[in-house]
């Protein structure tokens, strides 16, 4: 290999070796990088750099495919410079190939194809990519990680929600097999309540033997019902209003699968703050009721609540509680007490108004405790459709009575007759053990003893009651034993008479004295 020396011509450093040409091109636009260019243009440092390269290439017989240099001095001089690659036409190196650094190299290395040194945001070609001033190895690792993250983010969209399935319960409704959708713990109750009304009206029908249904299927059936509605009046203004309502309803339908935001007013069972969600109920002719009303016999509460909605009342309570006016503070406390006393979102006055407002045989949606239920009025009584998934196999359990605010109604079948959920006790439960029987008998005897003492006018005491109960229990257990002894020993009756009659004891002592006598 012939030795060659690097020459400096007009700011260009050219080094020649066998089959290798190094070309460091000066950028005409780099006016602010004179310190770096002067450092690179230093003849002694450049000569040392090229000589080091030749020494590295000397052992190679074939033209090397890569060229490296440990430009420690240059790296110190250009530590603040950023390395940017030019386009392929400007950065082509004669008879050279790209260099990929190995991980074992400890010194910073980079490709010698074409280098441009520039300060931050200066001298960067408008179409050239921006690269780091660190080693190519570090830069490659960073870029690979960033690319992997970008690809992973692009290929990992928002996780699709799995379609929800709901079990279908078949009941006999007005002598017809009718499907009812059951609800899990966190199911979309507005959608289920509306769809159950459409099923009970036979507006929607499922194929026979259907066991599960998806949310998409429910939404499709509901959309068909909404689109099949026709305007009741042919007036031009009414048609335009109907078309607008249809458009709003179709936009609201997806919300039914996640829940509706309704804002009740405490003035009537049908009073809700108007929201686009209410349009669906209006179009499908489904009444929406609630029973959260203020008792008119409480004028202070009526004055504090007024005609406000729930959200407005909460804001009023917060504002009045921090007021400096004592009357406002008192009014806020009264309103807060009303919400606390009706935490079940149902008052007795509201229940009475609900029973009066609902029509006989009318299917409606009842809102309570942030839950939507299917309700019907039958012979003057209100019933809620049982949609709990736990009663899926209980075909006879269809309705639950709504007659108090506590929510402990009675279960009824499809004909509104009282029924009880079937319970299949186990064999152990069907046959209680002897210990359980004894405990039950003791409890029964204790109650009998209590009643006897009350009849005699004695004050019951815990100790005497317990003793009396034990005595009764003991006598009851001794009865079969005494009967057996009477059959085996006829004199057993006399021994029992000794414990109860003093005369019997006297007669027995007389007999004993007679037996002690002996005849000579």
From Swiss-Prot:
Residues 441-479 are annotated as: Ubiquitin-binding domain (UBD). Residues 1-155, 422-441, 467-520 are annotated as: Disordered. The keyword Protease applies. GO terms for molecular function: cysteine-type carboxypeptidase activity; cysteine-type deubiquitinase activity; K48-linked deubiquitinase activity; K48-linked polyubiquitin modification-dependent protein binding. Its EC number is 3.4.19.12. It holds the Pfam family MINDY_DUB. Keywords: Hydrolase, Protease, Thiol protease, Ubl conjugation pathway. One of its GO terms (biological process) is proteolysis. It catalyses: Thiol-dependent hydrolysis of ester, thioester, amide, peptide and isopeptide bonds formed by the C-terminal Gly of ubiquitin (a 76-residue protein attached to proteins as an intracellular targeting signal). The record marks 465, 468-469, 472 as: Ubiquitin-binding. It comes from the Eukaryota. Residues 43-54, 93-112, 132-146 have a biased composition (Polar residues). The active site is at 189 (nucleophile), 371 (proton acceptor). Residues 26-37, 511-520 have a biased composition (Basic and acidic residues). Residues 77-86, 469-498 have a biased composition (Low complexity). Hydrolase that can specifically remove 'Lys-48'-linked conjugated ubiquitin from proteins. May play a regulatory role at the level of protein turnover. Belongs to the MINDY deubiquitinase family. FAM63 subfamily. This is Ubiquitin carboxyl-terminal hydrolase MINDY-1. It comes from Danio rerio (Zebrafish). The lineage of its organism: Eukaryota, Metazoa, Chordata, Craniata, Vertebrata.
């Amino acid at each position: 290999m012939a030795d060659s020396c690097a020459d400096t011509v007009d700011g260009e450093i050219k080094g020649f070796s066998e089959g290798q040409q190094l070309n460091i091109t000066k950028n005409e636009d780099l006016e602010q990088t004179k310190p770096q260019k002067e450092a690179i243009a230093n003849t002694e440092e450049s000569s040392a750099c090229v000589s080091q390269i030749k020494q590295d290439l000397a052992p190679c017989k074939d033209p090397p495919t890569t060229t490296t240099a440990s430009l420690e001095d240059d790296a110190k001089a250009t530590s603040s410079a950023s390395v940017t690659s030019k386009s392929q036409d400007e950065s082509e190196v004669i008879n050279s190939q790209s260099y990929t650094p190995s991980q074992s190299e400890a010194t910073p290395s980079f490709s010698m194809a074409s280098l441009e040194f520039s300060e931050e945001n200066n001298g960067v070609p408008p179409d050239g990519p921006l690269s780091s001033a660190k080693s190519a190895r570090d830069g490659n690792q960073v870029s690979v990680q960033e690319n992997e993250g970008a690809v992973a983010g692009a290929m990992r969209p928002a996780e699709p929600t799995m379609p929800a399935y709901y079990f279908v319960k078949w009941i006999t409704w007005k002598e017809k097999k009718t499907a009812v959708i059951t609800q899990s713990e966190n199911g979309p109750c507005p959608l289920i309540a509306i769809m159950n009304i459409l099923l009970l009206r036979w507006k929607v029908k499922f194929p026979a033997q259907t066991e599960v249904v998806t949310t998409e299927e429910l939404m499709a059936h509901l959309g068909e019902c909404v689109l099949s509605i026709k305007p009741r009046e042919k007036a031009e203004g009414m048609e335009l209003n109907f078309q607008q309502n249809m458009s709003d309803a179709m936009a609201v339908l997806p919300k039914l699968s996640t829940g509706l935001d309704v804002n009740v007013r405490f003035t009537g069972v049908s009073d809700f703050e108007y929201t686009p969600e209410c349009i669906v109920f209006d179009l499908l002719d489904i009444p929406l009721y609630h029973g959260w009303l203020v008792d008119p016999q409480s004028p202070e509460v009526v004055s504090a609540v007024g005609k406000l909605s729930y959200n407005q009342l909460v804001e009023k309570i917060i504002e009045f509680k921090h007021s400096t006016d004592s009357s406002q503070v008192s009014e806020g406390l009264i309103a807060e007490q009303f919400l606390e006393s009706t935490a079940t979102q149902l008052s007795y006055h509201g229940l009475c108004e609900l029973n009066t407002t609902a029509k006989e045989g009318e299917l409606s949606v009842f809102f309570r405790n942030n839950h939507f239920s299917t309700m019907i009025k039958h012979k003057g009584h209100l019933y809620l459709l049982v949609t709990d998934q736990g009663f899926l196999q209980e075909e006879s359990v269809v309705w639950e009575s709504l007659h108090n605010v506590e929510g402990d109604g009675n279960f009824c079948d499809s004909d509104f007759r009282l029924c009880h959920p079937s319970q299949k006790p186990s064999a152990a439960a069907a046959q209680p053990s002897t210990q359980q029987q004894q405990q039950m008998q003791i409890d029964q005897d204790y109650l009998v003893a209590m009643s006897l003492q009350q009849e005699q006018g004695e004050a019951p005491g815990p100790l005497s009651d317990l003793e009396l109960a034990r005595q009764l229990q003991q006598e009851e257990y001794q009865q079969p034993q005494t009967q057996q002894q009477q059959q085996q020993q006829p004199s057993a009756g006399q021994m029992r008479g000794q414990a109860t009659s003093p005369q019997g004891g006297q007669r027995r002592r007389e007999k004993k004295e007679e037996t002690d006598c002996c005849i000579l």
